[in-house]
Amino acid sequence: MQQLQNIIETAFERRAEITPANADTVTREAVNQVIALLDSGALRVAEKIDGQWVTHQWLKKAVLLSFRINDNQVIEGAESRYFDKVPMKFADYDEARFQKEGFRVVPPAAVRQGAFIARNTVLMPSYVNIGAYVDEGTMVDTWATVGSCAQIGKNVHLSGGVGIGGVLEPLQANPTIIEDNCFIGARSEVVEGVIVEEGSVISMGVYIGQSTRIYDRETGDIHYGRVPAGSVVVSGNLPSKDGKYSLYCAVIVKKVDAKTRGKVGINELLRTID
């Protein structure tokens, strides 16, 4: 694996010079191998090690290099034809392959090659970009988007129209991460490498980036870039120091543990926020 990483790191330093016409065989094979390993889930751009999320930057670099070495090609689809550098994940799947991998894909859901989809996942008409990792038992609901290299945990529900930001455009240092057992409400956006920790509930229409203030009304603490585990979050505003205006923020209205989540439905958690 170290040899593979070295090839990627070296090629990335001269990425501006690389084109589909001049990409050397060693680089091309290394990039394709990494994309295949990401596609199978054998590698992932970020993983939790000793309780901390670690981003493997060289894997992200391999994804970026794939756009340099590959030319656009015609991609056949049920409703239309497409023209892109990245093939679709399911282009060569037959019924036996779908049965073996054990997830559902509702048309016209689109998943790019290099994204991993785990067992018991349901993809409604949605979009999952290259390098993303979607773990077991997750629902990606209608018109939800999982951005490049985003990490989605087990038993997550991404509601209709949710946007989970990617790392490629604009270029971000770390992927957006939604940990296990989270619920992200309809039309919410979580971007710029924000981490939503395990068991959190994000209400409908909440927007969280690195600069968004995440205000805990019980403690008065303000978080940036991280929603603490077990948080129930709604959209809100905080007043300016002079009291003349207010600016958007996300508000943690309560904390819940796994036991409470097991007894109380998501809708009930969001309705009883006073």
UniProtKB/Swiss-Prot annotation:
GO terms for molecular function: 2,3,4,5-tetrahydropyridine-2,6-dicarboxylate N-succinyltransferase activity; nucleotidyltransferase activity. It catalyses: (S)-2,3,4,5-tetrahydrodipicolinate + succinyl-CoA + H2O = (S)-2-succinylamino-6-oxoheptanedioate + CoA. It is an enzyme of class 2 (transferase). PROSITE patterns: HEXAPEP_TRANSFERASES. It is found in: Cytoplasm. GO terms for cellular component: cytoplasm. Pathway: Amino-acid biosynthesis; L-lysine biosynthesis via DAP pathway; LL-2,6-diaminopimelate from (S)-tetrahydrodipicolinate (succinylase route): step 1/3. Its EC number is 2.3.1.117. It comes from the Bacteria. Substrate binds at residues 104, 141. InterPro entries: DapD_Trfase_Hexpep_rpt_fam, Hexapep, Hexapep_transf_CS, THP_succinylTrfase_dom1, THP_succinylTrfase_N_sf, Trimer_LpxA-like_sf. Keywords: Acyltransferase, Amino-acid biosynthesis, Cytoplasm, Diaminopimelate biosynthesis, Lysine biosynthesis, Repeat, Transferase. GO terms for biological process: diaminopimelate biosynthetic process; lysine biosynthetic process via diaminopimelate. Belongs to the transferase hexapeptide repeat family. Homotrimer. This is 2,3,4,5-tetrahydropyridine-2,6-dicarboxylate N-succinyltransferase. It comes from Escherichia coli O157:H7. The lineage of its organism: Bacteria, Pseudomonadati, Pseudomonadota, Gammaproteobacteria, Enterobacterales.
